[in-house]
Amino acid sequence: MFLENTVNHKEQFGWIEVICGSMFSGKTEELIRRLKRAQFAKQKVEIFKPSIDTRYDEEMVVSHNKNEIRSSPVPAAANIRILAQGCDVVGIDEAQFFDDEIVAVCNDLANSGIRVIVAGLDMDFKGNPFGPMPALMATAEYVTKVHAVCTRTGNLAHYSFRKNDNDKLVMLGETEEYEPLSRAAYFNAMRQNMEVKDAEHLSKDGK
């Protein structure tokens, strides 16, 4: 379990924590846990999420287990820098959907004495590093990688497999659209998809 750092008020610098993993791995759950601990300690906390994330609620950050905490939806990372002034702790959910400026924003906040907690997908559905997450993980003092359970093998899962043929990079969804898979299960699923597409192309060419 992650234990919060002890604040050195003489140093007057904060830090960055990143919580990453696949879908259904408990990223938002862990983010909410840390933020509520800070609220219980009477620290001033602000939470932000990208305004495109309206799956459960337009304003609340909600985990798959329905735990929730109030947030401020923002269209761009630059808004966070303005709205977070005077905070002790800043939480950011679904960080992979923000523009690249989120990295500079998080570092600016940490340099001004704020504890910054970021949660997001580390890989997209194609298995590639997702958006600004690699840079956030590189600059963070603490990185926590959480895992789901593979729906096909029961092993640890760290891939988010998309069940449909939609090729858009950003597609919000739940269990109907995605499932967490282990490396072996993901490799096999992607290979089967390629075989199906190849068969479809051959069928069309043969007509």
Briefly describe each language-model feature range.
Residues 94-109, 123-130:
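Conserved ATPase-coupling elements of RecA-like P-loop NTPase cores
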Residues 141, 147-165:
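Conserved AAA+ ATPase core "coupling" helix
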